[in-house]
Amino acid sequence: MILIQNAEFELVHNFKDGFNEEAFKARYSDILNKYDYIVGDWGYGQLRLKGFFDDQNQKATFETKISTLDEYIYEYCNFGCAYFVLKRIRK
């Protein structure tokens, strides 16, 4: 369980041990509060965060649906990079 800005997240995928809680908390911005999932990927020593919505969320566009994660990783991330997926826990 990861807690940041009164939001709880669960680590659901951790490819190549990409998750680093300290780096995540340092890079997290309140603009990400609206998303159901946060994906973090590493490139050139930098952590990049991107938000995704659950597929059924009315706010989701095609590009922000979590079901497009594989395409995002393939198209926008460095080949074979470490990455992680956090799911927001709503109460």
From Swiss-Prot:
Per its UniProt entry, which superkingdom is the organism in? Bacteria
Keyword Disulfide bond belongs to the record: yes
What is the protein name given in its UniProt record?
Putative antitoxin YutD
Query: Briefly, what is this protein's role?
Result: Probable antitoxin component of a putative type VII toxin-antitoxin (TA) system. Probably neutralizes cognate toxin YutE.
Its quaternary structure? Homodimer, probably forms a complex with cognate toxin YutE.
InterPro entries, sorted: YutD-like, YutD-like_sf
User: Keyword Disulfide bond: yes or no?
Assistant: yes
List the keywords (alphabetical).
Disulfide bond, Toxin-antitoxin system
What is the name of the gene encoding this protein? yutD
Cystines in this chain:
77-81
Q: Please name the Pfam families in this protein's record.
A: YutD-like
